Amino acid sequence: VVGGAECKIDGHRCLALLY
């Protein structure tokens, strides 16, 4: 998973990585 840890730290970054 790309940015799995990032998602927990910043939900907005998680969305950015998903797209």
Curated annotation (Swiss-Prot):
It is an enzyme of class 3 (hydrolase). Expressed by the venom gland. Optimum temperature is 30 degrees Celsius with tosyl-Arg-methyl ester (TAME) as substrate and 37 degrees Celsius with natural substrates. The keyword Zinc does not apply. Its EC number is 3.4.21.55. It is found in: Secreted. GO terms for molecular function: serine-type peptidase activity; toxin activity. Inhibited by PMSF, but not by heparin, hirudin and antithrombin-III. Glycosylated. It catalyses: Preferential cleavage: Arg-|-Xaa bonds in fibrinogen to form fibrin and release fibrinopeptides A and B. Residues 1-19 form the Peptidase S1 domain. GO terms for cellular component: extracellular region. GO terms for biological process: proteolysis. Keywords: Blood coagulation cascade activating toxin, Calcium, Disulfide bond, Glycoprotein, Hemostasis impairing toxin, Hydrolase, Protease, Secreted, Serine protease, Toxin. It comes from the Eukaryota. The keyword Chaperone does not apply. Thrombin-like snake venom serine protease. Releases both fibrinopeptides A and B from fibrinogen (FGA and FGB) to form fibrin clots. Also activates factor XIII (F13A). The activity of the enzyme is stabilized by calcium ion. Monomer. Belongs to the peptidase S1 family. Snake venom subfamily. This is Thrombin-like enzyme gabonase. It comes from Bitis gabonica (Gaboon adder). The lineage of its organism: Eukaryota, Metazoa, Chordata, Craniata, Vertebrata.
